[in-house]
Amino acid sequence: MQELGKAEHTSIRVTPQGENRVIVEKDLSSEEMILNMGPQHPSTHGVLRLECKTDGEVVIEAEPYLGYLHRCFEKHAEMVDYPGIVPFVDRMDYLASMNNDFAYCIAVEKLLDIEIPRRVEFMRVIVSEINRIASHLVAIGTYAIDLGAFTPFLFCFRDREHMLNLLEWTSGARMLYNYILIGGVAYDFPKDFARRTLEFVKYFRPKALELQKLLTENEIFVKRTKGVGMMPADVAINYGWSGPMLRGSGVEWDLRRVDGYSVYPELDFKVCVPDGKFSDIGDSLSRHVVRALEIEESLNIIEQCLDKMPEEEGFDPRSAIPKRIRPKAGEVYGRAENPRGELGFYIISDGKSTKPLRCKARSSCFVNLSAMKELSLGQLIPDLVAIIGSIDIVLGEVDR
């Protein structure tokens, strides 16, 4: 710890005789200290370092230091062709690789102005929503264990295995799928995929409700998160928040509804925002509640897609994939609703090369984490753990 200086404070102590009788003690001095949290701290969810300026137990300022996991994604993207960028995109938010690929392919396909087969669109949405649920289960499970609840963590990872098995059966990989490609997907669904997926949805619905009650109705969990890390809606918008973070502040903003990309306009689902029943709108508990509610909506989306997806005998999911990708000169921004918010790619093509001139990734985790100063002001040191967990960061995407 390092001494920064002394601050003068005035404290007021109320005597037992009544609220009107007070003793004022002036000129009490306290030391402002710097406390380093991370980059090895388990509750920072990766190599994140927070430099906390504290006055006793109260946080005056928390400054995040990033870059420990920087892997030069944007520079790599300028050195490989467009299809070769997909494996790099996989490794950004490694808990939601399907969603990463979806966002990147939307951007490139927009640049190429190509039409995607209808069955492929449904396939993309199905695997993305399965991956969204799996990602939310990691967020909820690790959040619980951050606050000392071990059982929900085990429940989350037990059920997450079913989703990873479905994705592995489809793509051949448990993580880093490289499945959604520019113009299509790598493989068609296995023969019994629809039946097994519906069986999973039927099995998991009551489990999701049980998991939701296990935490939102837990007195200790509520006390640790309710009213902690408050973020008003207008401030969240000014910071550029998106995803469950923005919806946790009461703003109905979901790119699946706002942009209506892929087949989402054909699907019936709710944009989840807290109603204030369990939490104070804008606090850490609200952000947790949004993720828990979104699991139910993703299950509904998966069921609808399986019902509406056209069956085509001998379907080739690679039929629309261009053999050689050399877009016309221009620039484009494509985005998608990831489990952690808006993931976007700004791509510039010079019209001559098979490699992008520039590929800029807009990370939702980076933007959400940028508000750490605002979230931590006046909070207690133990509450920093609750705040960081509610952001649900993945440092692979933050640092890129």
Curated annotation (Swiss-Prot):
Location of this chain's protein in the cell: Cell inner membrane
Bilayer topology annotation: Peripheral membrane protein
Keywords assigned by UniProt, alphabetized: Cell inner membrane, Cell membrane, Membrane, NAD, Quinone, Translocase, Transport
Any one GO molecular function term: NAD binding
A single GO cellular-component term on record: plasma membrane
Species of provenance: Chlorobium phaeobacteroides (strain BS1)
Matches recorded under SUPFAM superfamilies: HydB/Nqo4-like (SSF56762)
Lineage: Bacteria, Pseudomonadati, Chlorobiota, Chlorobiia, Chlorobiales
Stated name of the protein: NADH-quinone oxidoreductase subunit D
Membrane is among the record's keywords: yes
Keyword match Transmembrane: no
